[in-house]
């Protein structure tokens, strides 16, 4: 093998390792999305999510149609021990579109990874209670000013809990 061929092979190898490093270590940062989430997988069921009340931001990883995970930073609140996440604005976010097709997701909360299912909150009264919690936790007027945008909320369920709720 010639010296120039060896150099090309080495360059390709280095580029491959750099690309793999970016893919494997690409977690979201603030408003910048990422791919796979890192952390310790939690396999025990969570029956009370109140520990999230002191957590300002969590990460969500969804599975879009194109096969690579999509992760982003989101806010959360707990209400009566249940966990809810939300999104605002005129257009649905990328993660919302993904869960509309596949409700399975993973949440990263303080370095722990929770496999979950995400379901839209349809009930108006519950949505209002969640919005009040969001206002308490995040002071929406301070964040958005007087024009607080419309919000959509989603309930976080663990796969085992979702399976138990199905009618027989």
Regions found by a protein language model. Give the residues of each.
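Bacterial N-terminal signal peptides that target proteins for export
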Residues: 2-15
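C-terminal motif of bacterial Sec signal peptides marking the signal peptidase cleavage site
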Residues: 22-25
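Short, surface-exposed loop and linker segments with low hydrophobicity and enrichment for Pro/Ser/Thr
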Residues: 50-53, 75, 146-147
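Short beta-strand segments
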Residues: 55-89, 105, 116-118
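Short, conserved active-site entrance elements at the starts or edges of catalytic domains
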Residues: 27-69
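Short, structured beta-strand-loop surface elements
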Residues: 38-40, 45-48, 66-69, 90-168
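Hydrophobic helical h-region of N-terminal Sec-dependent signal peptides
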Residues: 16-20
